[in-house]
Amino acid sequence: MKRSSGARLCSTAAIGVLSFSLLTACSDEGSENTSGSKASSSAASSPAPAAKALTTAELEKLLLAQGEVKGYKVASGDDTLPSSKSKVKTDKPACDPLAWATAALAPGDTDANASNAVSEDKTSAATAKPTDLADAFDIDMTYVGLSSYAGDGAEKAMKAVSDGVAACAGGYGLKADGESTKVTRTAAEKGAAKGDETVAFASDVDMEGEGTATFHTAVVRKGNTVATFYTVNFAAMAKGGEMGAVPAAVIDAQVAKLK
């Protein structure tokens, strides 16, 4: 049976990946940048020391905090985001980095990962009260993930995302906590030049037989840290259609905090 718009709104209010499956409860209605360091003249020919990965605790300190982005609220996102990569699986290994990026998980090979959620703050705006449930959910929420890598791991993570966009152009199946959904199309997008490297892509997701919705993801590398951004508009998601782009203000503020 197809769920009503109200039920789907209930679901979208608590998801952070390209799937309804994380919300079954509602279904019934720093390290230093060594690449820039200079070797002494006596060791000019020696290879630069490999970059060290930041710890999860260090990454958590680099996440955006309340008050650092005007017009936005910051929350932990712990109640909506999957706790580990084992919770998010695809039917094509090449597509795993894309699914992880949309879930604020590390797209590459590392255990150092931290995440939160940054949403529009409309409470201070002098506007009329929402007229219906959909209007109340008409906010953009961006799930932000930070991951850190040793050596050239960050570059490899970015390549995995870029390669995945091409390999998964025809879509892929996604499963979370035993529930499945379908990404029907993936396409590269022109992302703003941020950090040292940026990969952006759009994903069309089947809305349980009620059309598709298009989501946008941006992945930015700065040094050996990778930041992922995935934006959901709850009202738009309930209707099907296209989500807004990842807010530039959120990307700019987060990348500025990275070492």
Model-derived features with residue positions:
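Post-signal peptide N-terminal segment of mature Sec-exported envelope proteins
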Residues: G36-K61
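Short, low-complexity, Pro/Ser/Thr/Gly-rich segments in the mature regions of secreted, periplasmic
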Residues: A248-L258
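Bacterial N-terminal signal peptides that target proteins for export
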Residues: K2-A13
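C-terminal motif of bacterial Sec signal peptides marking the signal peptidase cleavage site
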Residues: S21-A25
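Soluble non-cytosolic domains of exported or imported proteins
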Residues: A53, E155, G241-A245
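Bacterial signal peptide processing site
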Residues: S27-G30
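A small/polar (G/S/T-enriched), proline-flanked helix-loop surface module common
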Residues: V74-A213
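A short, solvent-exposed beta-edge/loop patch
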Residues: R185-A248
